[in-house]
């Protein structure tokens, strides 16, 4: 059955009149990126005056917050102080690198908390603030748990990961993300780019028989990618159909000359075989997608403001909880590298692929999340 309408921007068949969701996201992003300085100030002022509406996920405050943070890095200490005064502790990103007085207010609230739900939100906020005193507080709570710890699933060191860092048993801080972010933008398949999403391979998946794909190929020698510390090529390879059905992430070892060794994997239900849900048309769309690395860096939360953006570095737009994989070789937490929104590379796909890597062991992990 053919659909009655098409998107006037990209031609995607639709069951309704108007823009498809991806073109609508792009339109909203371009409008937000074009805000004049006085518009940014007005939105900041409105957010301060109506900060409770942010916690209630009310627009325009909710949308304005994510666009101010993701596209302009414009969450000010005044906004953070207003949030603290109103006891708005969600979304936790509002407290990213907040000043010392706000940090101290968060610590006071956390150490006064009686219930696990409040402690959970406050530890997330403190993780986003992320300075040495924030770490000392979470470390102390890990070593000397409060009664509310029994109501939580994970330790404070896991909450720290929300802010892109954690600490080990000795109290040493470990950085889990990069303080630089680049977007993947639409170019052409023939355009030269140090990063490519979805490169076709000849080998097949042992579970479903579908084609394996280099989901991310990245040349760290490009000047824009020097911040990654990869002096060569990183390749992340998996089965696009089965990666969401594995017991844990997909792993591979990479060599700086572009080589890949794919690690064995198991399906989550213990089955030997699975159906392949990626059609030949989907493989074609995935391996011929036009994404190339953007020319200029963007704010660290650029990939968190919408669901149609693929990024290298910065922060991930976690569908569920922040999840940093443990390296299967050295046991250290891996560093977050990239996110690929499945629906940007072939139609009707759901969820996001998160790519992480161990710089020491040259091992990549790929994990899937969806609602």
Q: What kind of feature is each model-predicted range?
A:
Residues 2-371:
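Preference for intrinsically disordered or flexible, low-complexity segments
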């Amino acid at each position: 059955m053919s659909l009655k309408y098409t998107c006037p921007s990209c031609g995607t068949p639709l069951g309704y009149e108007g823009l498809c969701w991806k073109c609508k996201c792009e339109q909203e992003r371009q409008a937000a990126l074009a805000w004049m300085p006085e518009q940014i100030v007005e939105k900041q002022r409105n957010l301060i005056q109506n900060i409770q509406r942010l916690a209630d996920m009310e627009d325009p405050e909710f949308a304005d917050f994510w666009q101010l943070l993701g596209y302009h890095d414009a969450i000010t200490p005044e906004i953070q102080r207003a949030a603290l005064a109103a006891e708005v502790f969600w979304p936790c990103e509002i407290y990213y690198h907040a000043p010392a007085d706000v940090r101290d207010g968060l610590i006071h609230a956390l150490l006064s908390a009686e219930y696990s739900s409040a402690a959970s939100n406050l530890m997330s906020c403190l993780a986003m603030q992320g300075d040495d005193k924030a770490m000392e507080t979470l470390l102390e709570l890990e070593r000397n748990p409060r009664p509310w710890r029994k109501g939580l699933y994970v330790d404070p060191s896991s909450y720290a990961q929300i802010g892109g860092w954690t600490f080990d048993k000795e109290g040493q801080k470990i950085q889990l993300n990069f303080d630089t972010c680049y977007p993947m933008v639409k170019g052409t398949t023939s355009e030269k780019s140090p990063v490519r999403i979805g490169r076709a391979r000849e080998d097949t998946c042992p579970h479903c028989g579908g084609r394996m794909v280099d989901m991310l190929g990245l040349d760290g020698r490009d000047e824009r990618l020097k911040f990654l510390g990869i002096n060569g090529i990183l390749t992340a390879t998996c089965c696009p159909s089965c990666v969401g059905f594995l017991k844990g992430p997909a792993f591979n070892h990479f060599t700086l000359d572009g080589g890949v060794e794919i690690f064995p994997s198991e399906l989550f239900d213990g089955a030997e075989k699975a159906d392949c849900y990626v059609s030949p048309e989907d493989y074609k769309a995935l391996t011929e997608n036009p994404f190339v690395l953007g020319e200029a860096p963007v704010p660290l939360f650029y990939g968190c403001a919408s669901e149609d953006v693929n990024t290298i570095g910065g922060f991930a737009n976690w569908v569920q909880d922040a999840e940093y994989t443990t390296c299967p070789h050295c046991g250290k937490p891996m560093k977050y590298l990239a996110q690929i929104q499945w629906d940007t590379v072939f139609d009707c796909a759901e969820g996001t692929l998160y790519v992480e890597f161990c710089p020491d062991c040259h091992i990549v992990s790929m994990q899937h999340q969806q609602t």
